[in-house]
Amino acid sequence: MDDLKMLRGLGRELEHEPPGSLVRQRQRLVDAARGRPRKVRLPSRWALVGMVAVVTAALIVVPAVLLRKGDLRPVDQPNPFAAGSGKMLNVLIMGSDARSRGGPARSDTLVLVHLPADRKHVRAVSVPRDSLVRIPACRTAEGKLVSGGTGPINAAFTLGGAPCTQRTIESLTGVRIDSTVTIDFGGFKKMVDALGGVEVTLPKAVTDKRTGLSLPAGRQRLDGTRALAYVRVRHGLGDGSDLSRVERQQRFMASLLRQAKSQQLRNPVRFVRFLAAAAGSVTTHPRLDVPALEAIARSLEKTGADAVTFSTVPVSPSPHDPNRLAWDRDAAAALFAQFKAEN
């Protein structure tokens, strides 16, 4: 099949559930300050990199620390990822639902994280998966050249994996990305189960026929399978929009991290199981080795939770497809300018 033809059809093939209604989407866009990052206060220092990005920090940094038995010894050679190295760091985080039944893999979550050279603050920008964008020609990890076209932004991952997603984000933002981190959703379920489940509190009961998810109102503990359905469902919870789903994911991840930290103190064996599941859930491109991970962890030691900002790419309903979102180019350019120049 021609790559461009495949791309044009991905809008229908990739979405197992339609986007929220245009009315709800418009209302959310009106309610939010366009492009204005909001402060996010996280529950503990363990949650440093803000919401979804926090999970990645835990997944790639904590296993590295464990390999060194918790001793973050300084490396002998200067590391470009360390604070004071004069190097800022941009990391693209993706949540992927790689399919076991032969279907196309998709990137469900996209977050671009910026660590300035002094590591005094962290910026994380979420990219709605309903964004309709131009996907440039790119090469896969195996070196295959795939043609581009216009399509939903998560189609880039289906066409060419992490390299094509990185190329697409770089072309849209003008930001150079140092590393791409992919979190496998199958591993996500194992992580939740390794902790014995994660607690959530629902203001009302949730029933979704598409996923089979059925949850009562109130406080409850979710196992891995139900947790994954909970963070991905769009109907019957919130206003049905992609933006509402992103916020729910963020709250769940913060709860997961609080519980992981608690298990570290109360049940070390269970915590080690969690780390093992986490280590098996993440891949990086280009690969981040242990010294790089240690340097990132050390550089964030003095970064307070109040120094973390989280925002979403400013968008509006696409004039070409009412079920998709178009970026506000000027506002997005101003937002991502912070990723290219130190303040």
Where do the model's predicted regions map?
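Core hydrophobic alpha-helical transmembrane segments of single-pass membrane proteins
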Residues: 51-61
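N-terminal export/targeting signals for secretion/compartment entry
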Residues: 1-52
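Non-catalytic, solvent-exposed segments at the cell envelope interface
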Residues: 43-47, 61-343
